[in-house]
C-alpha cells in the first residue's frame, strides 16, 4: 500500500487488487483494501521546514492553529471541543511520502548508531505515512472565514494535512505504569 499526495489529501491505494490477499516481499500475507483519506484541516505552525521541529509534541510551547477545510469548515464540527484541554491530531507525513520507508531506522535518541524496527520508533518514514501528536487546545476562533483551533506544543511542519482530530481523554490516554522503551524520559533540550 502507498499514499499519493494531492495537495491537502492523501489517498491509500493498494497494489495489485481491490480486496484480497497481497503477497509481500517477505512472504507475509496481508489483507488489502482501498480507502481515500481526505484532510479535514491544515496545521499552521511557526516551523517552516522540518529541521527546526521538536522531536516530540509538548517539548516546546510554540503556538499555532488547526484550520478546518472544505465541508468540515463549520462550527458544528467542533461543538463541545473546548471542554477538553488537549487534542490528538492524526496527520499525514506529507513531506516524506515520496521517499518511502524502510523496515528498520536509526532513532536519533540512540545517536544514529543502532537500528530498530520502524514500529518500535516514532520515525516519520512510516509504511502508511500517518502520524499522531497530542497538543494543548487554547480556544476555538474564526479567522478569514475558517474555523480554527488555537493550539500549542505541536511538532508539525507548517501546512501539515490533518486527517482527524480527537479529544485527549486522561483516564484512557494516560496509562499508569506504561514503559517507554528507549524514550522513558523526555530528551534534554
Summary of predicted features, one role per range:
Residues 2-3, 7, 13:
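Low-complexity, intrinsically disordered or signal/transmembrane-proximal segments
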Residues 27-134, 138-189:
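Glycine-rich, low-complexity intrinsically disordered segments
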Residues 18-30:
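Short, Lys/Arg-enriched N-terminal segments with co-localized hydrophobic residues
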Residues 9-10, 30:
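Cysteine-centered motifs
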Amino acid at each position: 500500500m502507498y499514499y499519493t499526495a494531492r495537495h491537502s489529501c492523501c489517498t491509500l491505494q493498494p497494489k495489485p487488487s481491490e480486496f484480497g490477499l497481497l503477497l509481500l516481499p517477505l512472504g507475509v500475507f496481508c489483507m488489502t483494501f482501498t480507502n481515500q483519506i481526505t484532510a479535514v484541516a491544515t496545521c499552521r505552525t511557526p516551523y517552516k521546514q522540518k529541521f527546526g521541529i521538536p522531536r516530540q509534541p509538548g517539548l516546546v510551547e510554540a503556538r499555532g492553529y488547526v484550520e478546518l477545510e472544505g465541508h468540515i469548515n463549520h462550527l458544528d464540527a467542533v461543538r463541545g471541543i473546548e471542554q477538553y484541554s488537549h487534542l490528538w491530531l492524526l496527520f499525514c507525513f506529507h513531506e516524506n511520502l515520496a521517499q518511502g520507508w524502510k523496515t528498520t531506522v536509526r532513532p536519533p535518541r540512540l545517536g544514529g548508531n543502532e537500528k530498530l524496527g520502524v514500529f518500535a520508533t516514532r520515525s516519520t518514514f512510516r509504511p502508511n505515512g500517518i502520524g499522531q501528536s497530542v497538543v494543548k487546545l487554547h480556544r476555538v476562533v474564526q479567522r478569514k472565514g475558517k474555523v480554527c483551533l488555537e493550539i500549542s506544543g505541536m511538532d508539525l511542519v507548517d501546512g501539515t494535512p490533518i486527517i482527524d482530530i480527537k479529544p485527549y481523554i486522561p483516564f484512557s490516554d494516560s496509562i499508569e505504569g506504561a514503559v517507554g522503551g528507549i524514550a522513558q524520559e523526555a530528551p534534554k533540550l
